[in-house]
A protein has these predicted regions:
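Domain-scale signature associated with acetyltransferase and cell-envelope carbohydrate enzymes
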Residues: 1-140, 167-168, 186, 202, ...
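Glycine-rich, flexible loop/turn motifs
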Residues: 94, 160, 196
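Beta-rich strand-turn-strand
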Residues: 116-127, 174-189, 194-198
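Histidine/lysine/aspartate-rich catalytic loop segments that bind and position anionic ligands
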Residues: 128-161
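Surface-exposed acidic, glycine/proline-enriched linker/cap segments
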Residues: 155-165, 169, 175
């Protein structure tokens, strides 16, 4: 299947493939079954229809799923990667998913890379600057259901909600779960497959289920 795109100078990016870049300039890209690059006008339609505010040079690969009943604010120079072929074909997930309830709030800084990441907020989830998140990672600020079994399918007012904060320069590996109330300190790394349920110290590596301290990272 082929798709015709209009080349847009504002959406330049480095693919490491000169032929790919030349095809962009010629306005013709060939992909199999999935759109892997969205031009600026199409991107604006997706975000604007969902009430999402965003900065400059936001690049989308594939089509993100957005359900915004609260507030979603994206920074500048971001990449939302949902494609399963083309750029960064290591993506193993179904794509970027951003969802807020009426009370939910998602805010990101600049240079944040979401690679098939799901962010679900009923309270507040804040991401700083220069953050990389691997495929299939889920970030939530709520239990989703009550703990007592009689209330799990009802009494939504009793669900526990706590803000999540991810500070600058954090790298989160693939297939991680970041749970309610978590604070991940500046410059830290979360190993692939980890479940984070508490506070992560700055400039540290945490891994496991639940994630535990592995070692410190030297500050430059």
């Amino acid at each position: 299947m082929s798709f015709l795109f209009k080349y847009n100078e504002k959406l330049k990016f480095d693919t490491g493939n000169e032929n790919y870049y030349e095809l962009m300039k010629d306005g013709l890209l060939h992909f199999s079954k999935v759109i892997t690059f969205i031009t600026s006008p199409f991107l604006k339609v997706i975000l604007n229809l969902n009430g999402v505010s965003y900065g400059k040079n936001v690049t989308v690969f594939g089509i993100p799923r957005i359900e915004n009943k609260g507030s979603i604010k994206l920074g500048s120079n971001m990449r939302l990667i949902s494609a399963k072929c083309g750029y960064n074909s290591g993506n193993l997930s179904g794509g970027v998913f951003l969802r807020t309830s009426k009370s939910g709030k998602i805010t990101t800084g600049d240079e944040v890379y979401l690679n098939g990441t799901s962010i679900i907020s009923e309270e507040e989830i804040t991401l700083g600057n220069r953050i990389m998140i691997g495929a299939n990672t889920v970030i939530m600020d709520t239990n989703s259901h009550n703990v007592p079994y009689k209330d799990r399918l009802k009494r939504w007012d009793k669900i526990i909600r706590k803000p999540v904060k991810i500070e600058d320069d954090v790298w989160i590996g693939a297939n991680c779960f970041i749970m309610k109330g978590v604070i991940i300190g500046k410059g830290s790394i979360i190993g692939a497959g980890s479940v984070v349920i508490g506070e992560v110290k700055p400039y540290s590596i945490y891994a496991g289920n639940p994630a535990v301290f592995v070692k410190a990272i030297e500050e430059e």
